[in-house]
Amino acid sequence: MALDSESSASNRQGSRNEQDTNPRLTAALCLTALGVVYGDIATSPLYAFREALHNIAPDSRTPESILGILSLIFWALIILVSIKYLLIIMRADNHGEGGILALLALLRPWRGSPQHQRNVLIVLGLFGAALLYGDGMITPAISVLSAMEGLEVAAPQLTSYIIPATTVILVLLFMVQKRGTARIGRVFGPIMLVWFVVIALLGLNGIIHHPQVLVAVNPYYGINFFTDNGWSAFRVLGGVFLALTGAEALYADMGHVGRAPIRLMWFALVLPALLLNYFGQGALLLLDPHEAQPFFHLAPPSFLYSLVGLATLATIIASQAIISGVFSLTRQAIQLGQSPRLTLVQTSSEEIGQVYVPAANWFMMIAAVWLVLHFRSSDNLAGAFGIAVSGTMVITTILAFFVMRERWHWNILTAVAVTVGFLIIDLAFFSSNLLKITDGGWFPLAIAVFIFTLMITWQQGRQLLIQRIHKETESFQDFLQRIVTDPPVRVSGTAVFLTIHQHDTPPALLYQLIHNKALHEQVVLVTVITEEVPRVPAAERLEVMELSSGFHRIIVHYGFMQSPNVPVALRACETLGLKIDLDTTTYYLSRASLIPTDERPGMALWRDRLFAFMSRNSAWPTAFYHLPPEHVIELGIQVEL
């Protein structure tokens, strides 16, 4: 049955790819794009313009400076989101999937690249992924908090309840993650459709009262803003960037709905609605440059309570999108061998992409609640926002250069010109955000360094462990020859041994033979390989090889968006001529006990200890490979690092 569901998942992916090139996209798919993809960037009007203006002294908030900031927001949305992400970066899909790890896998730096290039790509990709974890903690905090701050305008007497209410909403949001979003996700799209229509109408109303604001589409005002304000204009870029914080999510979430629906909804609805609202806020600020909450003051007083409620729903949806994105990113990292095995819970029997990661969920919840309690306002929290996403954008641009050259075969001049053009803008935003380090920007950087250290240590430690075991293990060819020469006693049943190296004898097999002096009649060696593609169709999943003396080798292929299920794979082997009775099958696993030491070459001792700690606390292979616990025997081995 699980195999059938994977087949149907592959079929859904195939039909989605067909829709991706079909101009007659369904309304349902476009609504899904609104709910899944656009939540983050949709809620930026709550705080982006306000925070950009806060970097200007009150006596310098002239009409020219307001128009200058508005012009910067306009052209940033056009150049970075519309052109860079929607038209260029989203072409770099890995069999329909996007995101920085999918982009890294697309480049396949593990195979054939020069050593220095391989190291640079892996470090960039892993650090970019690590930065997104910081974004996953800050986005829920600042989004929900900024929505609740609408109470300051609607009901000033309720201001003292903003922090407690935000905390309660965040805790509830993270607590319901284990139930999945399959049901409530269906209403996300319609809610976001209402949100975009409302913010567009609010902005249009502001523009009608002050249509002169439309001159800000002229880039002259943005350029003039820099020439007139100098250093303070550079600081403003950190606030302007908040209008772009959901751009990376457009690429990361591409696998959910496909490229075409995302592009269609951006140009048909999302971009016009955002621009109307930003220009409406600009019109309001031209009339009152000292307005503290320009977004909420666009609404008539009678609509404020409804707007606060709608904004809260929109920010919850935005938070849900980034939380789900972190879960998906974590699964990719685990399957690609860049993270320890963590418990993964499939929350939908229909959508293979919906997964819940308890460890990541509680870590993000604690961090988000701490951020709210520590910073206490979205103004203060804005200092911590932006660094993670702007850093990821820089890394995405660099990785995209290699895609242009190696995958799209662009000539060097075109690739360099496009990359340098985007990098100049990306680095300007990133540098401006670095000025926020003392105001809270240290938090996402600290989280990124912490996560990156874990990921790079796990990856290198795993490689060292595999090398050490390989050196100390008998080749399977020699082992098989020994079995033929001196046959052991055979007992009924099937023994399954999981092995990483196809040409090595699994340590558990050696120890089982030494201690029991016998082998099962049927011995199956299983190697699970995670390919650098999101999904491997069920028809291409298995390779079955008959060896000799009752031995078979099975190679099982999965994509990095799939969860391995060894019993299901073994059951499917019957279609390839190998029948395995799962009721009489015993699974033998090797459990390595790691001994950190500084006597061997490799990592520093503290990293050896960190790797050993992660290995001890990673999810058991029994659960990870969906093995029945009552049929599993683990044999321990000691390995010096």
Curated annotation (Swiss-Prot):
Region (Disordered) location: 1-20
Comp. bias regions, Polar residues: 1-14
Pfam families registered for this protein in UniProt: K_trans, K_trans_C
Gene Ontology MF term list: potassium ion transmembrane transporter activity; symporter activity
Catalytic reaction list: K(+)(in) + H(+)(in) = K(+)(out) + H(+)(out)
Topological type in the membrane: Multi-pass membrane protein
Protein localization: Cell inner membrane
InterPro entries (alphabetical): K+_transporter, K_trans_C, K_trans_N, Kup
Main location as per UniProt: membrane
Keywords (A to Z) from UniProt: Cell inner membrane, Cell membrane, Ion transport, Membrane, Potassium, Potassium transport, Symport, Transmembrane, Transmembrane helix, Transport
Any one GO CC term of the record: plasma membrane
Transmembrane segments: 29-49, 69-89, 120-140, 156-176, 188-208, 236-256, 267-287, 307-327, 355-375, 384-404, 410-430, 437-457
Biological role stated in the UniProt entry: Transport of potassium into the cell. Likely operates as a K(+):H(+) symporter.
Family: Belongs to the HAK/KUP transporter (TC 2.A.72) family.
Protein name: Probable potassium transport system protein Kup
